[in-house]
Swiss-Prot record:
Mg(2+) 1 binds at residue 66. NCBIfam families: atpD. The keyword Oxidoreductase does not apply. The modification N6-succinyllysine is found at residues 14, 112, 117. One of its GO terms (molecular function) is ATP binding. It holds the Pfam family ATP-synt_VA_C. Keywords: Acetylation, ATP synthesis, ATP-binding, CF(1), Hydrogen ion transport, Ion transport, Magnesium, Membrane, Metal-binding, Mitochondrion, Mitochondrion inner membrane, Nucleotide-binding, Phosphoprotein, Translocase, Transport. This is ATP synthase F(1) complex catalytic subunit beta, mitochondrial.
């Protein structure tokens, strides 16, 4: 635990900090609300992230959580220019290795001098549960140093917060504690709350955290993801059904939520367009049973138009990622928020109804 793994010698430091610490006082916290633009259309439009907020990426196995996190590091961390901390908690060693080498290739990590602005902390799948339980707290402590000592706006990426809970469950079993629901540790809510309360914005700086959350068997009522829900400002839910349609990122536009989706924060235009998009998608969802039984021909002309627009909107929410260029062969795109709002506004107005569905993939 605490050893460098990149074969570049010992870490030279004079300052040490305990990984268990108290959350900041209420008086030191900042309450300003500001949107963090990611360049990912479906996120910025329908469930925007708050600067200094806690964001959860929910999804089952192989729906694209880690790829989305890597794209956020690529888009936000580079544009934002501040410090980033990545805590790899109980995930695949290969993914951690890939991320490290990609950061070197893209210049986020500079091996020649001290200009790098990212810290990587790993406790991968093969590590004992004690190491996996501590690595999330270690990453958080590093982020707190950048916020409190250097006054930075820090981005903290945790992949995967479920493994933090899982490691706590294993440690609890080794200690002989009586398990709670579904075999989790009896201190599940306390463990999660103690960590999450430290991730906040103070008057010195901010920590914006993006946490990938594995959902066991795609069950959002499982105690581990359900306990995490209470602490989040925004949730991005990745859907297997959308991934099966070949739409990536496979973000569910109806299940994903954000606390700052408020006209007083994002503005009336953004709010109205987002709610208009969600209304069409919800109407389409409610018509799907009728379509399955009776077919499209039995729908009214108005419903046919709703279905047509909804299918086009679904495809327009897709986007090629820069970090996935090697797999898809398509160049990644970063879309400004103004362009996103304008594009969907024109779609809702029917300006592009004459175009076929295929035209809506970027």
């Amino acid at each position: 635990i605490g050893e460098p793994i990149n074969e570049r010698g010992p870490i030279k430091t004079k300052q040490f900090a305990p990984i268990h610490a108290e959350a900041p006082d209420f008086l030191n916290m900042s309450v300003d609300q500001e949107i963090l633009v990611t360049g990912i259309k479906v996120v910025d439009l329908l469930a925007p992230y708050a600067k200094g907020g806690k964001i959860g990426l929910f999804g089952g196995a192989v729906v694209g959580k880690t790829v989305l996190i890597m794209e956020l590091i690529n888009n936000v961390a580079k544009a934002h220019g501040g410090y980033s901390v990545f805590a790899g908690v109980g995930e695949r060693t290969r993914e951690g290795n890939d991320l490290y080498h990609e950061m070197i290739e893209s210049g986020v990590i500079n091996l020649k001098d001290a200009t790098s602005k990212v810290a990587l902390v790993y406790g991968q799948m093969n590590e004992p549960p004690g190491a996996r339980a501590r690595v999330a707290l270690t990453g958080l402590t590093v982020a707190e140093y950048f916020r409190d000592q250097e006054g930075q706006d820090v981005l903290l990426f945790i992949d995967n917060i479920f493994r933090f809970t899982q490691a706590g469950s294993e440690v609890s079993a080794l200690l002989g504690r009586i398990p709670s629901a579904v075999g989790y540790q009896p201190t599940l809510a306390t463990d999660m709350g103690t960590m999450q309360e430290r991730i906040t914005t103070t008057k010195k700086g901010s920590i914006t955290s993006v946490q990938a959350i594995y959902v066991p068997a795609d069950d959002l009522t499982d105690p581990a993801p359900a306990t995490t829900f209470a602490h989040l400002d925004a949730t991005t839910v990745l859907s297997r059904a959308i991934a099966e349609l070949g739409i990536y990122p496979a973000v569910d536009p109806l299940d994903s939520t954000s606390r700052i989706m408020d006209p007083n924060i994002v503005g009336n235009e953004h709010y109205d367009v987002a709610r208009g998009v969600q209304k069409i998608l919800q109407d389409y969802k409610s018509l799907q049973d009728i379509i399955a039984i009776l077919g499209m021909d039995e729908l009214s002309e108005e419903d046919k138009l709703t279905v047509s627009r909804a299918r086009k909107i679904q495809r327009f929410l897709s986007q090629p990622f820069q970090v996935a260029e090697v797999f898809t062969g398509h160049m990644g795109k970063l879309v400004p928020l103004k362009e996103t709002i304008k594009g969907f506004q024109q779609m809702l107005a029917g300006d592009y109804d004459h175009l076929p569905e295929q035209a809506y993939y970027i």
